[in-house]
């Protein structure tokens, strides 16, 4: 089992191992936690694929998980300094801060918007489209086959709530959208709480196996992995790292851009999707057709796996799809699957 997880502070030892034991899998199951920031869930799928290709295993579960609502605040060790001590937000420090430039990932997004001349209006329009696509997808039950209801325990003996669908896409107010203040750059800024992704809890997982194992276990595969590729660039340019990884993937697989039916590019910020569409000259009608992280949420260690899960269900038989996700530090992962 490979499970992506970014903010592991206060989770206890080996989060992937915990997921296996508490899920009731055999204690002999081999487990590894993967941290490639937002690409963690997708990298888990790629590592699983490599394990199958090398013959190390023949059945591997891969995915990602993040509970951002439970990430603690940090307090430095040592004596209490005169004047008090400062708590550090674990989400911001370990998940959302560019180590090299010492500022929030949103500042990197602003830098990309400026470089590529992507306006606030373009980002808002993209975000509104994402919310509308997700609402329409839920209406059409496009997510029905990939969602697992989760019982959420309640206090004081109250019965658990059965959590069956994403919440974020319902929380939008389109009338106030273009009036929201910019967050990271007050003057001439473009990124707002509306056109960026949100802080969320979530998990996604896939079972991967060799063709021989599928035959032996008498299971019918949903899709096959065609290829995968990583890419890296300057840390401040992380939003456009998918545009580094995707061409490598297409070259490696020998597949033309025009032959890709659907694209899933993670919406850490709306500018990420807009920028990569622009650089790669992708058809917007084929990108994030059911919305993405802006409208559904972005539990950082999980999102990369969710993109792959959704492609498995959204593609039609015989179609190929590409999922890509950028990550802090200037990286990105990409994967191609065929239904």
Q: What would you call each of these model-derived segments?
A:
Residues 59-111:
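Flexible glycine-/small-residue-enriched beta->alpha junction loops
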Residues 2-57, 100-104, 174-198, 279-309, ...:
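Conserved catalytic cysteine-centered active-site region
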Residues 174-238, 244, 309, 314-321, ...:
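Condensing-enzyme catalytic core mediating Claisen C-C bond formation in acyl metabolism
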Residues 122-216, 279, 284-286:
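N-terminal extracellular/periplasmic Venus flytrap/periplasmic-binding protein-like
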Residues 1-39, 43-59, 65-82, 147-163, ...:
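Conserved beta-ketoacyl condensing-enzyme motif
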Residues 36-66, 113-142, 205-212, 277, ...:
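Active-site-proximal alpha-helical scaffold in enzymes
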Residues 15-19, 44-47, 105-112, 128-133, ...:
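Short, well-ordered amphipathic alpha-helical segments that serve as non-catalytic structural scaffolds
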Residues 108-110, 154, 226-295:
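Active-site pocket-lining segment
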């Amino acid at each position: 089992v490979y499970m992506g997880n970014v903010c592991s502070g206060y989770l206890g030892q080996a989060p992937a191992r915990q997921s296996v034991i508490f899920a009731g899998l055999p204690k002999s199951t081999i487990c590894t936690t993967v941290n490639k920031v937002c690409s963690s869930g997708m990298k888990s799928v790629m590592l699983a694929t490599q394990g199958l290709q090398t013959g190390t295993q023949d059945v591997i579960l891969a995915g990602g998980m993040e509970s951002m609502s439970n990430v603690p605040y940090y307090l430095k060790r040592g004596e209490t300094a005169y004047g008090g001590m400062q708590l550090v937000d674990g989400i911001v420090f370990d998940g959302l801060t560019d180590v090299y430039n010492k500022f929030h990932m949103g500042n990197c997004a602003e830098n990309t918007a400026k470089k590529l001349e992507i306006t606030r209006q373009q980002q808002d329009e993209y975000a509104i489209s994402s919310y509308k696509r997700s609402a329409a997808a839920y209406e059409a039950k496009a997510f029905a086959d990939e969602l697992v209801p989760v019982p959420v325990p309640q206090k004081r003996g109250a019965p658990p709530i059965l959590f069956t669908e994403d919440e974020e896409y319902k929380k939008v107010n389109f009338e106030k959208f273009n009036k929201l203040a910019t967050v990271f750059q007050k003057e001439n800024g473009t990124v707002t709480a509306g056109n960026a992704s949100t802080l969320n809890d979530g998990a996604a997982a896939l079972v991967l196996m060799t063709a021989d194992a599928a035959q032996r276990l008498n299971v019918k595969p949903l899709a096959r992995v065609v290829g995968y590729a990583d890419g890296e660039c300057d840390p401040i340019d992380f939003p456009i790292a998918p545009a580094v990884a995707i061409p490598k993937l297409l070259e490696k697989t020998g597949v033309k851009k025009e032959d890709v039916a659907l694209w899933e590019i993670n919406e850490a910020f709306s500018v990420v999707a807009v920028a990569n569409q622009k650089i790669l000259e992708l058809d917007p009608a084929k990108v994030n057709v059911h919305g993405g992280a802006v409208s559904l949420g972005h539990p950082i260690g999980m999102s990369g796996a969710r993109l792959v899960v959704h492609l498995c269900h959204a593609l039609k038989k015989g179609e190929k799809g590409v999922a890509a996700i950028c990550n802090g530090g200037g990286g990105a992962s990409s994967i191609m699957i065929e239904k």
